[in-house]
Amino acid sequence: MWRALRRLIAANPMGFFLWSIITKWYLIIAVASLITLYYTVLGLKKIGFIDYFGRETEDILSQSKAVAQNCIPKLKLVNGKLPLNEFWDCLSDPGEYKHEEVTGARVLEDEINKFMQKQTDSIADTAHPIIHPYEKLENQNNLNNTLSDNNR
């Protein structure tokens, strides 16, 4: 990076000047944006908007799950027609979502757990030899960190 910067300065000092101004403004705008974002989120948390948004999102998701569980199965063909009246009635009051243990979910979870257990580290931890660089070893091919009695 420094080599490229030196080449840029030597080739075009005005280019370096422009680059430094753009970099400075970029940093100023980035820092100001982060500070503004922090205080905006802090203000939203203080007035309770983030908690309200979380509660409403959870309520909407639970209603969506209840519709998927209770109303979608009513969309079966009966005598070649869809019973849309029953479906619309169900949409007005979908009921409560009941968590059911589905075999497909259990199979998927078991497969994921099997895969995660089989995964091993691809790189083994290596022990680096600790040898004094100025000490001469009798055996130059000694890679096991063992010094002979003469070298201790």
From Swiss-Prot:
Name the InterPro entries on file. Answer: DUF2670
Q: From what superkingdom does this record's organism come? A: Bacteria
Q: What protein am I looking at?
A: Uncharacterized protein RP269
**Organism of provenance:** Rickettsia prowazekii (strain Madrid E)
Q: What is the lineage of its organism?
A: Bacteria, Pseudomonadati, Pseudomonadota, Alphaproteobacteria, Rickettsiales
